[in-house]
């Protein structure tokens, strides 16, 4: 009989691994330190692309990455903000804002997953008690807090930037744990079966709020992490008093890290000189470009002219993008001229979900353009990628400077775990595997550009949203590598995992529960 009967997956938003384990070393996170010293820990857990809340949390909770969600086992969420081309005119998807139909779009995310994947709550089995506390990626949850949109509004009001912000955020942290404990203490109140939940999701978003306002180096950000450590300690202590700790595994991780930019840029010159017009479903339905989001990574959507329906947005061909719009501009050249842009990625024409190519470009320090191609083949567990730089001496991600990574630049196809082992310690870890998965999703942008974090733009669907310098999204390790702790019950072995990926967490928890993962899961159990 399986000893472990309950699993709690806790995501602390916006925590980079190096800082997390440094705070543990300094003695500032004593409860996390205890989990580290008695359970499984990993200092090199690689997140998804791009390193923003969505899709990374979706990938954690489903154990898979994105792709062509219509035809292959994967999830369907490419980014936090994207353009839904299934409609004519297309609709904005922005999980942090109101949508075109004036509904809170975060509630749409469970539908956007598609039905070729499952959340961990679904994987534990029908009829089981499951809980989700402030985590909106919760398909399969028996109980979800906040229970109504009105309570969600009140919760968001609690998290506003006010003079009492710190107090309210600490209150929010405490509430997450208290709600979780109440599901164990008074299960009859929340579930049809009077049993504690077998699987639960927790999301602490307060750390992300403070990082964007003050940066991860600020005392208020670190103080908040210390408070989360405190309430996790309360969770462990109370579960022990209730008699549940010996049969409960607790996983602690983050969705992404963060970085500090030096400057906020302006895209006005790019737009004006290119003759492009921002699309808006109401104000400018005939616009031909949508910048879904651009902080350090920019996601650019363009409307093809090869369609008789003037409101429909098919993906344009690359030849059309080389001579685009009324001015006939080469969009690829123009995007590489944006201040601070160093990298660019796009699909080749004729790609399918089974095979295709992704074209990569890097502008080096001499403004010379370096090129490479990622070939992909297969889907699901058969998916593999091959990385071929045009010049073997100068590759896009600088992998050839490191022996393990350079060994995979051999003109052969390699698996996700081969790329993980070779690149987890580098900038742009796993990118050769993750970029084609992203572009296979028809919801993904036509062209993606990236700075190296020195300059950011803060554009969401064509509008500038803020001027903050504290960000996350790019492929540098500080944004792409997160911590992982798995502990609680003494049944968890004590061991350090040298490297892993965020999609390994769910299959590990399922293995401890004696459950099998869904066919879409690309992660592997760490035990």
Regions found by a protein language model. Name each.
Residues 51-52, 76, 80-109, 241-249, ...:
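Secreted, luminal/periplasmic, and some membrane-associated catalytic domains
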Residues 21-76:
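Short, structured active-site-proximal loop/turn typified by the sulfatase FGly-forming signature C/S-X-P-X-R
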Residues 23-27, 145-150, 215-221, 264-271, ...:
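Short secondary-structure boundary/capping segments
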Residues 41-61, 133-143, 203, 522-526:
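Short, solvent-exposed turn/loop segments enriched in Gly/Ser/Thr/Pro and often Arg
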